[in-house]
Amino acid sequence: LPFLGVETLEQEVAVARAVYAHPAAAEEMAQWNARLLMTSPMPQYNIVGTGEPRDELSEFEGMRVRATGGLGEAFKSVGAVPTSVTATEAYQAMEGGVVDTVAFAQHAHLSFGTINQADWWTANLNPGTVNCPVVVNIDAYDALSDAHREALEAAIPEAIDHYLSNYAELLERWDSVLAEKGVEKVEIAPDVIAEFQSKAGAPIHEAWIAEMEAQGIPGQELYDLVLSTLAEAKGSGS
């Protein structure tokens, strides 16, 4: 779901853990004989663009953006034109003027070279990200000895910490990457972010809740869980 207000990887991890622990998530995965083990956290996407920075909602009207899935729908709802070129085609799409902007997490802007085509990057739009769970086969998990199962579960916090520390290293040097490449860091004003959340977030959230409830999945309960967990994480300084 776009524009939930997640700002940090620590908040992302907290929300994922809460959702994964909910019985509805376990039941959903059990259809494929799978058990949710842990998240592999990915930073919030932000956009790089060419030309003048876009830091007002009205400036997204007609903007051609490489954004897929829910993020594409969110940008479309504020007048942008999403395109779903593959990640490997994003650089050429920017270079050739097929798109004005590309939405990726920082590491992907580096990996796919889109940062090299950019004039600016939004530091805090934070429209959303891709949730990437690690799952295991239920039968295989149940077949583990107590000692092996305990070792697997004990390794999860260490694995999450590794993800967080690895990304922290990249984020620490991100400002120097921007400076090196001459990319302007654009801070979106809080009132503009609130506009995005209202126009590009809330309607999609409401539609998702209704769709889940129609399928017998407690969409409202899960949504409320996400918001309460996020508020708690922010309150603790994550």
Task: Describe these PLM feature segments.
Residues 19-21:
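Core domains of carbohydrate- and sulfate-ester-processing enzymes
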Residues 1-13, 24-238:
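N-terminal secretory/targeting leader peptides
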